[in-house]
From Swiss-Prot:
Organism annotation: Escherichia coli (strain 55989 / EAEC)
Gene coding for it: hchA
Similarity field: Belongs to the peptidase C56 family. HchA subfamily.
Assembly behavior: Homodimer.
Subcellular location field: Cytoplasm
Catalyzed chemical reaction(s): N(omega)-(1-hydroxy-2-oxopropyl)-L-arginyl-[protein] + H2O = lactate + L-arginyl-[protein] + H(+); N(6)-(1-hydroxy-2-oxopropyl)-L-lysyl-[protein] + H2O = lactate + L-lysyl-[protein] + H(+); S-(1-hydroxy-2-oxopropyl)-L-cysteinyl-[protein] + H2O = lactate + L-cysteinyl-[protein] + H(+); N(omega)-(1-hydroxy-2-oxoethyl)-L-arginyl-[protein] + H2O = L-arginyl-[protein] + glycolate + H(+)
Name of the protein described by the UniProt record: Protein/nucleic acid deglycase HchA
């Protein structure tokens, strides 16, 4: 006998009118163990360059019916790329717009993963005690030790980051100083911070989570309502080209901009980023 799981969003009792994804959607799109593999970097980087992670610091995303989606950064999209980069020799720092702790979608945490969970525990303090992004931006110059900026996905990236002048300044610094920018799924929504000023990403191609897929997720209770705007439409308006219209785990490199389409791309993006950064900094 097959037990049917509910497609109704689950109540988040920590906030009024807030909801987690339905049991059904979690059964389809999350797993207690990740697909981490291919972590093989026999000649890791030994220098001072590191990664700046720009993380989400807000949990609740309003939808079109007034209900709140309980979100944050997706753990797989955050931790798998970082696992590869760390294994390749690159340490990382975490910053949020407010300087307050990173919010994670804990309902997507691979809690039985014997590699990812110890890695998360080892670095949890960085996410709990991030730097304030404005302070990081104020210190940036051509000699700064950040080799890359990494913006993880999760719908939490839609909150605050697309309007942040500090996010814009960090991205402008990275592109103009020949650093890497790494992102996946909803993370590229942060690139919208560039739309009202100098936009060095104009003309770049990326993979990202398709707007069409976001429009379907309320049907299975992943979100409690529809989004009030769609980041893919807005990225196209600012001159970016989204090369995927589905979710296949695809990754893409355009110069030093490295992107993936979804959590299914997290492992491949980690491999790509580690290989590209080793070639640039340890070659």
């Amino acid at each position: 006998m097959t037990v049917q799981t509910s497609k109704n969003p689950q109540v988040d009792i920590a906030e009024d009118n807030a909801f987690f994804p339905s049991e059904y959607s979690l059964s389809q799109y999350t797993s207690p163990v990740s697909d981490l593999d291919g972590v093989d970097y026999p000649k890791p980087y030994r220098g001072k360059h590191k990664i700046l992670v720009i993380a989400a610091d807000e949990r609740y995303l309003p939808t079109d019916n007034g209900k709140l989606f309980s979100t944050g950064n997706h753990p797989i999209e955050t931790l798998l790329p970082l696992y590869h980069l760390h294994a390749a020799g690159f340490e990382f720092e975490v910053a949020t717009i407010s300087g307050l702790m990173t919010k994670f979608e804990y309902w997507a945490m691979p809690h039985k993963d014997e590699k990812v969970m110890p890695f998360f525990e080892q670095h949890k303090s960085l996410f709990r005690n991030p730097k304030k992004l404005a302070d990081v931006v104020a210190s940036l110059n051509a000699d700064s030790e950040y080799a890359a900026i990494f913006v993880p996905g999760g719908h939490g990236t839609l909150i605050g980051l697309p309007e942040s002048q500090d996010v814009a300044a960090a991205l402008q610094w990275a592109i103009k100083n020949d650093r890497f920018v790494i992102s996946l799924c909803h993370g590229p929504a942060a690139f919208l911070a560039l739309r009202h000023g100098d936009n060095p990403l104009n003309g770049y191609s990326i993979c990202a989570f398709p707007d069409a897929a976001d429009k379907q997720t309320p049907e299975i209770g992943y979100m409690p309502g529809h989004l009030t705007w769609y980041f893919g439409e807005e990225l196209k308006k600012m001159g970016m080209n989204i090369i995927n219209d589905d979710i296949t785990g695809r990754v893409h490199k355009d110069r030093k901009l490295l992107t993936g389409d979804s959590p299914f791309a997290a492992n491949a993006l980690g491999k790509l980023a580690a290989q590209e950064m080793l070639a640039a900094y340890a070659g």
